[in-house]
Amino acid sequence: MRRSVWLLLLGAGLFLASACKAQQPPTPEYRLTATIKDIMDSMVDPSADVLWESVATIVSATGTEERRPKTDEDWANVRRRAITLVEATNLLKMPNRKVAKAGEKSENPNIELEPEQIEKLLNDDRQAWTTLSTGLFDAASVALQAINAKNAEGLLDAGEKIDAAC
């Protein structure tokens, strides 16, 4: 009987000790497919363009056109693009993502560095890249808040912040 009580107490003690130990969640396994350039070309740029073009004043020979989302469908479309832009910034910050495919050139003629050179600069100062990506996240989040409030002026102001962050 004494032995049973002792084993029971030992078992309970081991159980409690293991319960007190913080369980670490498994590290997520990311399967990176797209490069930073791919994300910029397919998610960031097109989404930012939709936000910028959704609120505008266009003056031409035929007159002045005020562009604003008007219907729930218009607002939903702009919202989808804002969410894409916000979440794309998280993808940009994921570790080990390649800048571009080897030998792939930017369409911007002002970018003279090879992808490997850009990647080295980025990896040498990861904090700067994270800060830039977070700035875009913050600006796009302001746009999303304006869209959720159906505030065209707020979206216009947020568009300027997105432009500055880009």
Task: Identify the function of each model-found stretch.
Residues M1-L10:
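Bacterial N-terminal signal peptides that target proteins for export
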Residues A17-A19:
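C-terminal motif of bacterial Sec signal peptides marking the signal peptidase cleavage site
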